[in-house]
Regions:
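Terminal domain-initiation and capping elements
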Residues: 1-93
Length: 93
């Protein structure tokens, strides 16, 4: 016997599952860390390309913050911890 589901119900359930698990790793601007330090940290920790790291760093500088990675909390925690260990302010939101 086949379960009876409407296609829209399945899509709605899948959207809820996908959106509730995803979180953002956000890096915040400060007056202490240099551009080079933030860029090198994003390359080393988040595996960004040089261009990605530079763009994120400029956004952090001009906008005050930038999302540098997405994923579940458990996935993002080691990235956040490594970024914070080198003195850069990062939070999972």
């Amino acid at each position: 016997m086949k379960p009876v589901f409407k296609e829209q119900e399945l899509v709605d359930v899948m959207e809820v599952i996908e959106t509730t698990d995803l979180m953002d790793l956000v890096v915040f601007n400060d007056d202490v860390n240099t551009f080079d330090h933030v860029i090198q940290t994003l390359i080393r920790v988040c595996k960004h390309t040089n261009e990605q790291a530079e763009q994120c760093t400029l956004i952090i500088h001009y906008k005050g913050k930038c999302t540098v990675k997405n994923g579940t909390f458990d996935f993002l925690r080691p990235f956040r911890d490594a970024i914070c260990e080198v003195g850069i302010d990062a939070k999972i939101v």
